[in-house]
């Protein structure tokens, strides 16, 4: 970049750090339940960020047809789209056991609920619940998120995969339900015990172990 401003003059300036991803900065359109976000993503040939994938029933239901809208609009406008650029968003806190996860989120889940109930007050994100145990049960029973073991997290991701027909990225919604140490441990368990289940990195060694045990 060569440019002159009131305070700086640049001569063939360039960034010293390469981007984290190939092809430049990824762009995406946010969507909850309406077709608007999906239509825009298809029109402009960019990613789709489904921020209502788990928190609202309408957002989960929309996963069944949103990508079809993206592809339809892409065909109409001559753009290219890829399911790998579809990101689903949802809150999770996992621990070694469900009991530990439930204990962890007592740190901050109540203020999170109160925010959606009293401050943000989004009509499409009305979340009931008065006591902490009730709040945890609502999150888990409604599929709005995950508070539990890695197995519960795997079930949730599979549920989203089946509903959507496939997507590229599962993005954890920041929530501060637990303290920083427990939150870090949750991320470690997600990386070690949930993500490999779907990406298949461990399958070759697991398959060999199964074969060896059958001899």
Residue spans for each PLM region:
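Active-site-adjacent structural elements that line small-molecule/cofactor binding pockets in enzymes
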Residues: 1-215
């Amino acid at each position: 970049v060569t440019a002159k401003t009131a305070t700086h003059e640049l001569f063939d300036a360039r960034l010293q750090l390469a981007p984290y991803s190939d092809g430049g900065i990824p762009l995406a359109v946010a969507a909850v339940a309406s077709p608007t976000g999906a239509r825009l993503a298809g029109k402009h040939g960019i990613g789709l960020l489904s921020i209502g994938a788990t928190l609202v029933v309408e957002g989960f239901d929309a996963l069944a047809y949103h990508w079809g809208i993206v592809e339809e609009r892409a065909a109409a406008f001559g753009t290219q789209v890829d399911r790998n650029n579809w990101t689903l968003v949802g809150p999770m806190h996992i621990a070694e056991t469900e009991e530990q996860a439930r204990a962890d989120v007592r740190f901050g889940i109540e203020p999170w609920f109160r925010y959606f109930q009293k401050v943000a007050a989004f009509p499409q994100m009305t979340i009931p619940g008065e006591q902490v145990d009730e709040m945890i049960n609502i999150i888990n029973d409604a599929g709005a998120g995950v508070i539990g073991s890695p197995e519960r997290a795997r079930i949730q991701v599979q549920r989203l995969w089946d509903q959507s027909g496939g997507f590229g990225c599962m993005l954890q919604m920041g929530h501060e339900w637990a303290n920083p140490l427990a939150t870090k441990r949750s991320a470690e368990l997600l990386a070690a015990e949930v993500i490999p289940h779907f990406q298949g990195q461990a399958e070759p060694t697991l398959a060999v172990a199964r074969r060896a045990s059958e001899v």
